UniProtKB/Swiss-Prot annotation:
Cofactor: record remark: Binds 1 zinc ion.
GO molecular function, one term: DNA binding
Source taxonomy: Bacteria, Bacillati, Bacillota, Clostridia, Eubacteriales
One Pfam family it belongs to: ATP-cone
InterPro entries named among the record's database cross-references: ATP-cone_dom, NrdR-like_N, RNR_NrdR-like
Cofactor: Zn(2+)
Native source organism of the sequence: Symbiobacterium thermophilum (strain DSM 24528 / JCM 14929 / IAM 14863 / T)
Single GO BP term: negative regulation of DNA-templated transcription
Recorded family membership: Belongs to the NrdR family.
Protein name: Transcriptional repressor NrdR
Amino acid sequence: MKCPFCGGESRVLESRPASDEEAVRRRRECLACGRRFTTMERVEVPPLIVVKKDGRREPFNRDKLLTGVLKACEKRPVPMEVIEKLADDIERDLRSSLDREVPSVVIGERVMEALRQVDGVAYVRFASVYREFKDLNEFREQLEQLLKSR
């Protein structure tokens, strides 16, 4: 690697995992000027693109996913660790697929399935917004399906 000070070649003095364990911190020394500097090495993850219902495309945003789940779980006995794990699992699954573009419908369905396992009320809350229930009959049908599956 080139030295940021003089452009000369450098050598690695020390390598160790960074604090987040997702990068490698390397301490280097320039062979030409002798100055030391630190570099960080991370795996480059290609962006995940969400295809919205209207065809628009936008980068995946974990915070949006987390916000939706948090709203569904509001005032429910669902620990934050469970909510974060749910978001992590969904994001990991999406990124591990070979597709770089994911329809928003797929994300919504995965969230609903995960919430169904975690908390029935949170599931129905999320489903009512996600599926845009028009009346009480649609709401009742979803509740009946939930009760049958338990």
